[in-house]
Structures are given as C-alpha cells and as structure tokens.
From Swiss-Prot:
This is Betaine aldehyde dehydrogenase. Binds 2 potassium ions per subunit. It catalyses: betaine aldehyde + NAD(+) + H2O = glycine betaine + NADH + 2 H(+). InterPro entries: Ald_DH/histidinol_DH, Ald_DH_C, Ald_DH_CS_CYS, Ald_DH_CS_GLU, Ald_DH_N, Aldehyde_DH_dom, BADH. It is an enzyme of class 1 (oxidoreductase). GO terms for molecular function: betaine-aldehyde dehydrogenase (NAD+) activity; metal ion binding. The modification Cysteine sulfenic acid (-SOH) is found at C286. The active site is at K162 (charge relay system), E252 (proton acceptor), C286 (nucleophile), E464 (charge relay system). Pfam families: Aldedh. K(+) 1 binds at D93, V180.
C-alpha cells in the first residue's frame, strides 16, 4: 500500500468512487516513490458533480453575506491549524522544500481566502435616481457553477486563489487539479466541508486535462472557467468555452519575464533579486524573471555575484528543513528542462554554472537539475524566447534604456517584469512602458491577496486576486422601478 493509499473523487460533500476504473499514480519526485493512486473522473462524474454543485449553489447563495463570510473564515482557521500537515503532503507530492511549503503555499493561500471572506459584505449594488417618480438599482448576483483547472506548481495555493473569490461571490466550484499534483486539493475539499460549506459547493475531480478538463470546459451547466497552464492548452480552453455556452474565462498562461538591472542599481540587491526570480521553487514559478538584462559594463561584476550566491543554494531532500532547493515536479519535466539546457549550449550561450542533471548518489533517484546560469545570451535563442519552467537563468547585456525596453517587450508573453534601480523616476518611466501585467520595482515575486495578478498578450486573460476578481465572479442585474403612472404610446 502506498503512503496515502487510493484517493477517490470529492463530490457533494463526500468522497465517492469514480464511475470508471482508471487510476493514475502520484509520484514523489524527490525519490520516485509512488505515494498514492488516484481515481480518474469520467464524463458521467462531471455530470453528477455539476448537478450537485447546482443544488449546493442555491443553498449557498441564499445565505447572508455574513453567514458565508463566517464559514470561509472558519476554513481559514482550519487551514492555519493544519499548516504543517498540509505542507508535508504538498512537499511529498511536488518535491518543493518543506521550508517553502510551510511558509508560503498554505500560508498565502489562506491569506487569499481570508481576504475574500472579508470582502463578501461589500458585494453590493447601486441605487440610481432617474427622475422624481423612477429609479433604478443594480444587484451583483453569482454566476452559478464555475470550474477551476489548476497547475502543478502551486497546487493548494492555486485551488484557493480560484475557489476563494468564486465562493465568496456565492458560486459553487468544480475544481480539477493537475494530474501531477492532486493531493492537497482533495484535502482542501475536506477543510471546506468541515468549516460548514454546504454539500456540492466545492467539488474535486481528479484526472487528465484531455478528459476531465475537456468535459468541464464544454459542459453547458458551467458558467465560467478559471484556468492556469500553458498557452496551447489555454487556447483550447477558450475555444471550448466559447464554442459551448460562451462561458466567461480567466486564464494565466505563463511567462518569459524580463528583469532589468540598471547601472545605478545596488548590484548585491540586484543579484539577490535575480536569484529569487529564477531559483525559488526550483525555478517553477510562472512569474519568474528568467531574462536578466544587465548593462554590458557590469556583466562581469554581476556574474561574479550570481556565481557566489548559487554556491549558497542548499540542495537536497525537500523534507530536510535546511534545504531550500528541491527536485523538479516530475521526471518527464526534468527531461524537458534538460532539453532546453542542451539547446542553450548548442546555440552558443556560455554556461556560467550548472547545466547538468544531478546524478550523484544523493540525487540519483530524484528529478533533480542543477541550478543553471547561462550568459552571453541572445534574444533569438530558444532558452531566451520559450518558457522553460525550471532553474535556468539567462543573462543578456544591453547598452541603453530605449534598447532594453524594446528587447524586454519583444516576447509573446507579458506576465511579469521588474526593474532594479536607485532612480525612482526611471523606475516608473520604464515600468510604464513594459508590456506586463505584474511589475516589481526593487523586489520580485510577492503576490499579496490585495494585488491583481494576470498577464498581457499571450500570458492570459483576466485577473486573479484583488477586488476586481471578486466582481468578475458576479453578473450585474439592473432593475428599474416606476412609482408613477405608466404611459403607453399605444
């Protein structure tokens, strides 16, 4: 028997068996251990989840704002009480260091849920005077049943980012986690039920995007889809959503984000920021600043500072709390990252450090890739143009501000961007010209609940977090009231 056994689907407030027989394995990428088997949902399971969600949503939406708020706040308390337990499960499933999952994944996810729980009472309409005898008012009403489709890099955090505003607005959600990292989403469903969420309001269906994801995005009973993943999959989701019932969509589709270091920057700070923007979570962060632009005159100094910091990375067993760099999420993903590294070598980028799989006995059983820094990179290189989603930094040099802005924007992506400079006038001037939805000045990577997150161009549609996201899980109903006589022209 595997560590976590056989995992069922979660529908209508309880674990239930799939109507099909297919299962798949959850694998710990640190050592290759099969830690669980998960049932694959079928189209019939999607149908029954939609039925359960529609029934539960009516109960949930009929509650007062304060009642819904109290239930979600209880869920926040439970998440925080179980932080360490959930963090260990996330570490086993993703390979992320325990030092990270204990302090980031559940903590920040719970923060988002607490934020939206507090906003529920502010979901209100307007009263609009028209004339002495007539006025109009608006109501913000929930969409109904919505779907969330998660990515594998932040499983429980993404499940909370998607479910928190949806539930706060009075909707029910059917969530499909990535088949690579599904375990904590099921635990989140347990937490919601324990907190008092009505049955059917949060359901979890495990399985592949080709089967479960396809069924969710085309189902006529679903009003909106929130998706995190790649561009190709996002286009399929959008086409399915439009071709079925004109569903609303929110999508975060990754990035190849520029980090611009200016000549007046504190180079130690710039190097620290570049390290966090490339190697946190083993480089598996959508917003990573993987195109690092430095003035040509400072290239050697900057490389020396990066090289010194790479030596301080603590690689190892992710359950060791001293470790801050674990394996990649899966063995197939490791092979993908290694192919990109070989591409960089072939195209003439110089390897400053790393560039190899980690095959020592200590790492041989896991999906480890050494932290890698390429320098002397060109804009046309594959490693510079495509999202690698691994611990690979590309250093590029530039001559002047106009040039670096133009090159930073030369990408199909537009998720994030950042500048490091001592001149705040320049910082704002440059940021205002960068084509990216999330920008940082003299920092990198923080995504607080209050701040909308999303991309320009092919990096996505819509936003997550912030007040605007809550509003987009509602629809506005306008009502006109006539207090006087009605006069017909007929």
């Amino acid at each position: 028997m595997s560590r976590y056994g056989l995992q069922q689907l979660y529908i209508n407030g309880a674990y239930v068996d799939s109507t099909g027989d297919d299962t798949f394995d959850a694998v710990n990428p640190a050592n290759g251990e099969i830690i669980a088997q998960l049932q694959s949902a079928t189209v019939a399971d999607v149908d029954r989840a939609v039925i359960a969600a529609a029934a539960g949503q009516k109960i949930w939406a009929a509650m007062t704002a304060m009642e819904r708020s109290r239930i979600l706040r209880r869920a926040v308390d439970i998440l925080r009480e179980r932080n360490d337990e959930l963090a260990l499960l996330e570490t086993h499933d993703t390979g992320k260091p325990l030092s990270e999952t204990r302090t980031v994944d559940i903590v920040t996810g719970a923060d988002v849920l607490e934020y939206y729980a507090g906003l529920i009472p502010m979901l209100e309409g307007q009263q609009i005077p028209l004339r002495d005898t007539s006025f109009a008012y608006t109501r913000r009403e929930p969409l109904g049943v919505v779907a969330g489709i998660g990515a594998w890099n932040y499983p429980i955090q993404i499940a909370l980012w998607k479910s928190a505003p949806a539930l706060a607005a009075g909707n029910a959600m059917i969530f499909k986690p990535s088949e690579v990292t599904s375990l904590t989403a099921l635990k989140l469903a347990e937490v919601y039920t324990e907190a008092g969420l009505p049955a059917g309001v949060f359901n979890v269906l495990t399985g592949t995007g080709q089967s479960v994801g396809q069924a969710l995005t085309t189902h006529p009973g679903i009003a909106k889809v929130s998706f995190t993943g790649g561009i190709a999959s996002g286009k399929t989701v959008m086409a399915n959503a439009a071709g079925s019932t004109l569903k609303d969509v929110t999508m975060e589709l990754g990035g190849k984000s520029p980090l611009i270091v200016f000549e007046d920057a504190d180079l130690d700070k710039a190097a620290d920021i570049a390290m966090m923007a490339n190697f946190f979570s083993s480089g598996q962060v959508c917003t990573n600043g993987t195109r690092v632009f430095v003035p040509q005159a400072l290239q050697t100094q900057f490389e020396e500072k990066i090289l010194a910091r790479v030596q301080r990375i603590r690689i190892g067993n992710p359950t060791d709390e001293a470790v801050n760099f674990g394996p990649l999420v899966s063995f197939p993903h490791r092979e993908s990252v290694l192919r990109y590294i070989e591409s960089g070598k072939r195209e003439g980028a110089r390897v400053l450090v790393g560039g190899e799989p980690m095959t020592d006995e200590k790492y041989a059983q896991g999906a480890f890739v050494a932290p890698t820094v390429f320098t002397d990179c060109r804009d046309d290189m594959k490693i510079v143009r495509e999202e690698i989603f691994g611990p690979v930094m590309s250093i590029l040099t530039y001559q002047n501000e106009d040039e670096v802005i133009r090159r930073a924007n030369d990408s199909e992506y537009g998720l994030a961007a950042g500048v490091v400079t001592g001149d705040l006038n320049r910082a704002h001037r440059v940021i205002h010209q960068l084509e990216a939805g999330i920008c940082w000045i003299n920092t990198w990577g923080e995504s607080p609940a209050e701040m909308p997150v999303g991309g320009y161009k092919h990096s996505g549609v819509g936003r997550e977090n912030g007040i605007t996201t809550l509003e987009h899980y509602t629809q506005i109903k306008s009502v006109q009231v006539e207090l006087g006589e009605f006069r017909s022209v007929f």
